[in-house]
Amino acid sequence: MNTQLPPKQRIVVGLSGGVDSAVSAWLLKQQGHEVVAIFMKNWEDDDDSEFCSSRQDFLDAASVADVLGIEIEHVNFAAEYKDRVFAEFLREYSAGRTPNPDVLCNAEIKFKAFLDHAMRLGADRIATGHYARVRHNPATGLHELLKGLDPLKDQSYFLHRLNQAQLASTLFPVGELPKTEVRRIALEIGLPNAKKKDSTGICFIGERPFREFLNRYLSHEPGPIKDDRGRRIGEHVGLSFYTLGQRKGIGIGGLKEKGAPRGGGEHEPWFVARKDLASNTLYAVQGHDHPWLQSQRLSADDASWIGTVPQPGQGGLAAKTRYRQADSACAVDALDAAARTLSMSFPAPQWAVTPGQSVVLYEGEVCLGGAVIAAADQRA
């Protein structure tokens, strides 16, 4: 559903080494466009580390470019990434929040630094392998960001900070396809990375243990872990290493002798429920459905709207408070466009609403934008 293009345009594709961007480049070539590829290097440290895949990703991207008969350029955006994305990532973790760097990376690197570089190369548009769609609405004159047609792969959540100029210059060729079809095409045309696994995790961390990585950049102070009755049940290694809803790695499994706090039986797993920075205390509760893990109201800041701004009292809205979550009906209770803040409520309780993560709003299949969760109520 991308805007209809003239017969031939110069399109610069962000070729990551993965199958989605590779098939995107092939589809554009099939449509008769002049396609040029750029491989973005966004993280410079540890190139020789067992956890870093950047070198192999570039080799895969170069192999794809060779098969497709297109030029590829290796561009280093590591300095921009550290200044615009990683520095904010560390600030948020230091403040006890859990940021989503992929959202900021898209807005600041892939659709700003990369877009600017592509335009200097004479590009008419850029393209990436994201599962999303762009549509021009003639009634409003606005470009709209739509969910990808594959509900299991939709990445509009991570793209909600894009603006009108960025959307007008961007194509998402695989957004109209299910992932299974993308894999089929890759195998059929003989792409060398057709069977490559999808990347997971935060791009600059790779496959390394998260705690090990974060420990290199943030100071930390151990402190008590308490349950919902205020009883000490363990010790944490530093609040920055934990996020709300976390189950693994808390270090208090098997404490059945502590009894059964509200919402969970004595054999149920423990979850991180609260972080108190003032007292350096981590709170954990037993049971997925514990009241402390349920919220129906939240406040958010740093709001970014793609086009139409949702209004208090507007019906038909839904939201996600984390990626891969099903849309949940919501209401905007208050919104300050100048301050870029909003407060929201949900008819149904939301699980482990986490400060620092994004709340993204939708009207049907249209992504309206979103904001960074500042705080959420927790049922007593």
UniProtKB/Swiss-Prot annotation:
Supply the Pfam families for this chain: tRNA_Me_trans, tRNA_Me_trans_C, tRNA_Me_trans_M
Principal localisation: cytoplasm
On the tree of life, the source organism's domain of life is Bacteria
Q: Which cysteines are disulphide-bonded?
A: 105-203
Note the coiled coil stretches, chain numbering: none
Reaction(s) catalysed (UniProt annotation): S-sulfanyl-L-cysteinyl-[protein] + uridine(34) in tRNA + AH2 + ATP = 2-thiouridine(34) in tRNA + L-cysteinyl-[protein] + A + AMP + diphosphate + H(+)
Where do the record's region annotations for Interaction with target base in tRNA lie? Answer: 100-102
* Gene Ontology BP term (one): tRNA wobble position uridine thiolation
Decide whether keyword tRNA processing is in the record. yes
Interaction with tRNA: annotated span:
153-155, 322-323
* Positions of ATP binding: 14-21, 40, 129
For this UniProt record, the keywords arranged alphabetically read as follows: ATP-binding, Cytoplasm, Disulfide bond, Nucleotide-binding, RNA-binding, Transferase, tRNA processing, tRNA-binding
Please indicate which residues carry the site annotation Interaction with tRNA: 130, 357
Q: Which GO terms describe its molecular function?
A: ATP binding; tRNA binding; tRNA-uridine 2-sulfurtransferase activity
Family indicated by similarity: Belongs to the MnmA/TRMU family.
Q: What is the recorded name of this protein? A: tRNA-specific 2-thiouridylase MnmA
Q: Which organism is it from?
A: Leptothrix cholodnii (strain ATCC 51168 / LMG 8142 / SP-6) (Leptothrix discophora (strain SP-6))
Ranked from the top, the taxonomy reads: Bacteria, Pseudomonadati, Pseudomonadota, Betaproteobacteria, Burkholderiales
Q: Which gene encodes it?
A: mnmA
